[in-house]
Amino acid sequence: MNVERSEFLAGVGHDALWALIEGRHGDPFSILGPHESGGMTIVRVYLPGAEGVDLIEAASGRVVTPFSIAHPSGLFAAAMGSRMHYRLRITWPDGEQITEDPYSFGLLLGELDLHLISEGTHYSLSRTLGAVEMAIDDVAGVRFAVWAPNARRVSVVGDFNAWDGRRNPMRLRQSAGVWELFMPRLAPGERYKFEIIDPHGNCLPQKADPVARASEAAPSTASIVASSTRFRWTDDNWMKGQSRQQRLEGPISVYEVHAGSWLRENGGRSLDWVELSQRLVPYVREMGFTHIELLPIMEHPFGGSWGYQPLGLFAPTGRYGTPEDLAYFIDRCHGAGIGVILDWVPAHFPTDVWGLARFDGTALYEHEDPREGFHRDWNTLIYNLGRNEVKGFLIASALEWLERYHIDGLRVDAVASMLYRDYSRNEGEWIPNRYGGRENLEAVEFFKHLNSIVHERCPHAMMIAEESTAWPGVTKPPEEGGLGFDMKWNMGWMHDSLSYIEKDPVYRSYHHGTMTFGMIYAYSERFILPISHDEVVYGKGSLLGKMPGDEWQKFANLRSYLAFMWGHPGKKLIFMGGEIAQPSEWNHDASIAWDVLDQPAHAGLQRLVKDLNGFYKDEAALQFGDFHSEGFDWAAADDAVNSVLGMLRYAPDRSSSVLVVSNFTPVPRYGYRIGVPQDGVWIEKVTTDAREYGGSGLVNGAVSSESVPAHGRPHSLWLTLPPLATVLLKSP
């Protein structure tokens, strides 16, 4: 078909043509692809660097016509007598490529999807935005979509187009500020980013996809097209088993883990998810923990942040394998009867230029005003929770982990920093809310909405808050004015109890109230007692290093403290290495010091933690009082002189009970009388002074009660309290 060159550019203005050539055009579909003109169909393609292009009929494979050069910059055009399904045969300097034309496809995202994105209620965001493997009209490829409402132009770039932003500019869907493009014949594994021109015409550093489901391992920063093939889970019985409420009422003993440093091979290589499923999962099961809590595994640029400064909120870090490898690890955990909790960070994000910061050239995910949008403690940016799309982005991220990866719970990091506008700020450095107060009302509503949606869509999932203040109602339902979390870390108990146990025993009597104070508020929330990674870093030393005294006393103090914790109301959490009394504080670049288990004292502590977990899981009395005040009484709260504390834990019907008595001095107490509710023979189930744990072997065994009133109870036991030890006795 003979066509004049001017006809190839009919309807294309001079300014529009140069905007396309220079990579500034915001509506490429108005020029590229098939267009009706003068009774024929003109097809234009912009392929800088191509030597030639042929138009091929898709059905037959025959060459219809070669493309003509419409502009020497790389704009080619061809004419068809009537519209047909066609392909392009492109000749490059290094070979040929046959593909469909990305600009021959119509609108990709539905109006409902766009509406839900704008409303902040599109909870399956990774199935709409990001890179989605799919087929359109039997053409396989990848649909790219990204929210960048203030950009002048957005292109998808990757190895497939030599990272040239001129080659594949995207279509803007004005109603939602979302850019979209279908790239035929791309497959999972392709690297990509977005190239964005900001409102002022500046080309930004290429951006990783905020909703990517896979990423390159750091320090590389490209996003990766993830497969749409579903992992074949084998955990149906686990997922359909206990409800969240049943799990909350039962034993919860959490082993907190940094995946990269739990165990390293010679040479310092971290284990991958498959290897962790073979090593970590059997260990946790053998130790009797009910859950593993993983420090954040979302993609993050700086390993030294331990994952707490993530940028890929939908992508597992590539440090330990593929997304499918992570799913395999979780599946193996569930097969072993172990739940998986994930640390999740909606409070802030790092300032890396290839990430979310000023994503489209404006403060899109963050606040514009640094008094709201910059966190000086961490040099990070704060999410703008007043924006629907940002709230929806975060909630969709939470659901991604719970639904796609079968995560059993999220521990939400740095909640306090979100709840207070003046958090870690001086006067004049923060903006009050609309009522003049310091509360972040947008964050309050965000948490209520987050927890309501999670509980509605994921009945199995637990939501846990790391909230370091006394904000009221963290674990109350939203309909009762609370934030809706299931549990909260008891930071106050952790600080108080560690402060006490770090003191020389000679001074503990003066601080006795530190150990009893926690019970004043113990039932104001549903608490987890956390001895977390935060307590063994930044010069704080290891758990063992915090203990006073000589080596024997250090181990005795730590054994007694952990048994007191396991006997105290509240679910349990301990960071890896604490269960073996690792001598040095945690180093994320090194393995836990497993070789210390060759020493009896370390092996003894490990055995104690295992036995404490076993007794806790078997004994209803140690579970019921975690959240119910009728499941707890002080047996001896006021013996400051002897630094002795006694607790009674009750089963729901009070048919059985457990007595927990701690002697926090190095002086054995012989003939220590303590009141008990039941008559009969009480059996010592655990004593931290047992020889198998590294103690001196001063034990009680079976103890018959006497009809001698004590501590307001009609019966009492005549006990031997070993030095620096805790004993747990079960009622008849």
From Swiss-Prot:
Signal peptide: none annotated. One of its GO terms (molecular function) is hydrolase activity, hydrolyzing O-glycosyl compounds. CDD domains: AmyAc_Glg_BE, E_set_GBE_prok_N. Pathway: Glycan biosynthesis; glycogen biosynthesis. It is an enzyme of class 2 (transferase). The keyword rRNA-binding does not apply. Pfam families: Alpha-amylase, Alpha-amylase_C, CBM_48, GlgB_N. NCBIfam families: branching_enzym, PRK05402.1, PRK12313.1. Catalyzes the formation of the alpha-1,6-glucosidic linkages in glycogen by scission of a 1,4-alpha-linked oligosaccharide from growing alpha-1,4-glucan chains and the subsequent attachment of the oligosaccharide to the alpha-1,6 position. Monomer. This is 1,4-alpha-glucan branching enzyme GlgB 2. It comes from Rhizobium etli (strain ATCC 51251 / DSM 11541 / JCM 21823 / NBRC 15573 / CFN 42). The lineage of its organism: Bacteria, Pseudomonadati, Pseudomonadota, Alphaproteobacteria, Hyphomicrobiales. The gene is glgB2.
